[in-house]
């Protein structure tokens, strides 16, 4: 799916099916997997295939969050211009450098560092749209 379509679906699921009401998580919690998806999605990325180490970008819920890793490392996620209206990724920086992929690898996350999303209120149809910037599919 195009990154713009993924974000729309992710936000629909997050906003409709994860609430603070008694029925806030729909269906079977699936041994914590649905809650894990919600936390990762709130950071702005989530795994579609749990075995390949690829996390596709969505829309961050937080302006800033830190993931504390082993050996004192931290992976910081920042969402600039983040708001209810600004839900579309305009650009991404990984460790201060432009990053054109619409996904990040597990290996990049566990190294520690900084992932910055620059958000806007209209889709950037160019971001992550090129085939080389999309996650590889199983063949």
Where in the sequence are the language-model features?
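Beta-rich accessory regions
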Residues: 19, 49, 56-139
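C-terminal substrate/ligand-recognition segments
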Residues: 7, 25-48
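A glycine-rich phosphate-binding loop feature that marks nucleotide/adenosyl-phosphate handling sites
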Residues: 14, 28-33, 56-62
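Single conserved hydrophobic/aromatic residue that forms the stacking wall/gate
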Residues: 1-13
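Long, well-ordered core segments of solenoidal/helical folds
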Residues: 14-21
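Alpha-helical multipass membrane-protein architecture
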Residues: 7-10, 42, 52, 85-90
